[in-house]
């Protein structure tokens, strides 16, 4: 209930203290389910793609959408446009696949599922963010138009055809032009070719990052607006568009066009007529009563047969053999669930180590951290090597 009360407090303050009394439109991160406390989480996109089952993705997002709708979220910011081209990329899990056709079908399903429950979708990121140089996040995509059209445009076209109301521009540049400054990409391609009529949203502070090219934050805001960006995210540049008009960098009509797109969506959402939420009603989505997410996770797994006892598991637990579970993620629930995951309670899931203890005798299991994720510690590594080299001794 606190989220609904907070929503109404924000809405009331804006309506009562702003000059025109225009209601706010709330957005929330939803790359694989709702990134909020007690949010209904889905498996990461890479696993969802491994199901090859768009209907299951659609069903899971329908549940997630119900929760978002009940919490007053108007826009779900959803990862679905990135096609994985380099597995070194740290955000690989946000991609459904390395295949543009499969990625497009999953994007389509995600949009339909979410919007069936009420919230609109901002599909991200456009375009070619999965093509970064050397797998470095937000680095340049060194490709041409053929690769764009064959590999990176299909998911966006599918999301737009499915009814996505928003597109988020990507951080990267393509052939030397930043996506947030690429009018061909944000106007000619998605609006004229794909028929998109919603809003184009910037990624976080991406407009301000154009300063590295323009050297002037006011110019950066004007450039992004002229290139087709309608809504900024955390940046300062769009707050300076009035100065950009005074300096002749943009015309008021260009700002009016962006404002019109935003106001149109607010009217379509009914926010002017019904700006507040009913504060009663359930917003927690129990996984037992809503098993779609768990089913999606199960269908994305590949079960391997342990032929010839290649893996050190045995049916006879009285054999006296031991199991070493090594690695910093083996007993860390949060690290199992991918990026864009909210803080969790310890009893919200089972770690790899927990699962091993459910099957085998706890006395037969030895957990070794092995290393830290963000710093080097030779002692932890030496301990793990020693135990695994002489298993009979522990």
Predicted regions and their residues:
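Glycoside hydrolase catalytic-domain context in secreted enzymes
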Residues: 1-394
């Amino acid at each position: 209930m606190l989220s609904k009360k907070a929503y109404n407090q924000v809405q009331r303050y804006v309506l009562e203290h702003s000059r025109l009394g225009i209601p706010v439109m709330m957005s929330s991160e939803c790359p694989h389910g709702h990134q909020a406390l007690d949010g209904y989480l889905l498996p990461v996109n890479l696993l969802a793609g491994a199901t090859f089952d768009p209907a299951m993705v659609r069903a899971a997002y329908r549940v997630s959408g119900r929760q978002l709708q009940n919490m007053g979220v108007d826009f779900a910011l959803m990862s679905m446009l990135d096609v994985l081209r380099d597995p070194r990329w740290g955000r690989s899990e946000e991609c459904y696949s390395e295949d543009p056709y499969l990625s497009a079908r999953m994007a389509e399903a995600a949009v339909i599922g979410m919007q069936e429950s009420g919230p609109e979708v901002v599909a991200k990121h456009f375009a070619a963010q999965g093509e970064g140089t050397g797998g470095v996040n937000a680095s340049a995509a060194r490709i041409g138009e053929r690769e764009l059209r064959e590999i990176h445009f299909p998911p966006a076209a599918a999301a737009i055809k499915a009814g996505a109301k928003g597109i988020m521009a990507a951080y990267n540049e393509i052939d030397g032009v930043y996506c947030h400054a690429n009018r061909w990409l944000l106007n000619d391609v998605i609006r004229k070719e794909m028929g998109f009529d919603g809003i184009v949203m910037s990624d976080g502070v991406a407009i301000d990052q154009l300063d590295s090219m323009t050297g002037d934050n006011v110019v950066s805001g004007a450039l992004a607006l002229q290139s087709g960006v309608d809504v900024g995210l955390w940046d300062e540049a769009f707050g300076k568009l009035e100065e950009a008009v005074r300096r002749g960098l943009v015309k008021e009509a260009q700002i009016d066009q962006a404002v019109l797109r935003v106001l149109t969506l607010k009217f379509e959402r009914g926010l002017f007529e019904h700006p507040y939420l009913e504060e009663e009603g359930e917003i927690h989505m129990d996984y037992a009563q809503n098993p779609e997410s768990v089913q999606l996770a199960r269908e994305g797994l590949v079960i391997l047969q342990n032929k010839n006892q290649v893996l050190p598991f045995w049916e006879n637990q009285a054999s006296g053999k031991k199991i070493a579970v090594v690695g910093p993620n083996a007993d860390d629930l949060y690290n199992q669930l991918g990026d864009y995951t909210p803080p969790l309670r310890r009893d919200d899931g089972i770690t790899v180590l927990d699962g091993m203890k459910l099957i085998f005798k706890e006395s037969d299991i030895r957990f070794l951290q092995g290393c830290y994720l963000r710093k080097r510690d030779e002692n932890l590594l030496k301990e793990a090597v020693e135990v695994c080299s002489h298993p009979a001794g522990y």
